[in-house]
């Protein structure tokens, strides 16, 4: 299981409410529309992958 520090992701986006919106949108893109993850999957769920992408600065608030 992945260890995600949500605080790091919040700092990248600005606040926790926007983080939820951005992460859920990205997870939806991967799950429904078949977009490729920008990080290794490591058997994680799409929401965890989205949070890892945000934490690494690969996804930004639009």
Curated annotation (Swiss-Prot):
It comes from the Bacteria. Gene3D superfamilies: 3.90.940.10. Its EC number is 2.7.7.6. One of its GO terms (biological process) is DNA-templated transcription. It catalyses: RNA(n) + a ribonucleoside 5'-triphosphate = RNA(n+1) + diphosphate. GO terms for cellular component: DNA-directed RNA polymerase complex. It is an enzyme of class 2 (transferase). Pfam families: RNA_pol_Rpb6. InterPro entries: DNA-dir_RNA_pol_omega, Pol_omega/Rpo6/RPB6, RPB6/omega-like_sf. One of its GO terms (molecular function) is DNA-directed RNA polymerase activity. Keywords: DNA-directed RNA polymerase, Nucleotidyltransferase, Transcription, Transferase. HAMAP family: RNApol_bact_RpoZ (MF_00366). Promotes RNA polymerase assembly. Latches the N- and C-terminal regions of the beta' subunit thereby facilitating its interaction with the beta and alpha subunits. Belongs to the RNA polymerase subunit omega family. The RNAP catalytic core consists of 2 alpha, 1 beta, 1 beta' and 1 omega subunit. When a sigma factor is associated with the core the holoenzyme is formed, which can initiate transcription. This is DNA-directed RNA polymerase subunit omega. It comes from Wigglesworthia glossinidia brevipalpis.
């Amino acid at each position: 299981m992945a260890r995600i520090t949500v605080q790091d992701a919040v700092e990248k986006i600005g606040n926790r409410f926007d983080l939820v919106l951005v992460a859920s949108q990205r997870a939806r893109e991967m799950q429904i529309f078949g977009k490729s993850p920008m990080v290794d999957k490591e058997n994680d769920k799409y929401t965890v992958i989205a949070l890892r992408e945000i934490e690494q600065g690969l996804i930004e608030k639009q």
